[in-house]
Amino acid sequence: MVSIIVSPVLCIRVIDDVEEPHHYVINLLSNQSAVDVCFGPLLHTYIPRSLDTMSHPARISLRAPPHLPFIQGFPGIPGGPSRRPPGVHGTVEIRVGAVPIKAKWVRVEIRKHEVIPPGFKTSSSEDRSTWEHVGEIQTLWTPQNTTKEFDVLETADFKFFLPLPENIPPTVMMMKESGIRYELVAAVCYKQKGGMFKKDASSVNKTTEDLRITKHELNSAWPLYNQPDTFNATAANGAIEMIVQRPYSAFGPNDRILLTAVLKSSQPKPFRVKGFECTLLEVVTVTQIPSSQDKKKPKKVAPPTTKSRTVATARYPIDETLGRGGEKSARIDIPMAPDKLLVTVRNGRSIEVGYELEVKAVCEGIPELAVKGIKYVVGPFSRAHSQQAVR
């Protein structure tokens, strides 16, 4: 390698045989910019290899409070006298090197990303993923002299607090990296010197941290979810009735669904009751968001698309005859496998997740009798952990 000093600000380095014989690279260093030019066998042919190899003059990083996570409080639950409001706490650290920089602003924000799961039709691949700000963008630093667009930024730490709205959906990871996720983004906008071949321009250096939002209003121990209720369905002009009773309407991973099913008959003709079947469905609803990049006249908004899958089943055999004035009942216990459940998702921009239970009486000699659409809330914790959190 041969290095030739042309001027105090320009250095030419010629490196032989970089990729192929008789090919050379000339690296031009000017001020804080660098350009690599690759020459072929003929000197008048060249290919730019890197138009900007400079690193950022300031390092930016995010740091959570000492021995604490970024997220404080209980997302989904408002703050109170003894409970801090839910939000993201932390510090943006700016570290400037030996060369001073001029900056325009330092900001921090929360972004929510929603990726539609596979199997749902979208108009384009771009429409499958959307993102939006959560709350306001917080500006931590600007030039003190309001007449200046840029000013010198020194090494500093900026503490911040970003409140979390109560109605945001929780983090949920679905198949093939789809679902809802959040990230904390900190950025600094500074003036980048162009050097010999480029004009001065602004550049943005940013850093991100993943945030996992757990919604505590979904905890199954809240009194709202522990009020018994009843559902019913009839057949044969009301002569046959099925009643489903449940003690609570929410559960979490490793919990069990408990309910009682009762079948009554007032018709003269007896029939055989084989048993009860229960099916818990996970219902995913996707609302397609039109792309903001589409400059054409917006088309008619497509209705939401819903798909369901079975996440748990239970059967209770009876195999007895039911006559006029008689009844058959069963206490049904449905265990929940933790690896098959997500959580209830409300207020998503494009994704919502719900859970519905269907209880069916399997009989011979009468029309199908079923109670459908019994809604449940699925939280992030088991009932035992939820009780501790609520206390």
Tell me the role of every PLM-derived stretch:
Residues 2, 6-9, 17-19:
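Acidic, Ala/Val/Gly-enriched low-complexity intrinsically disordered segments
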Residues 10-14, 21-391:
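C-terminal beta-sandwich interaction modules and adjacent acidic
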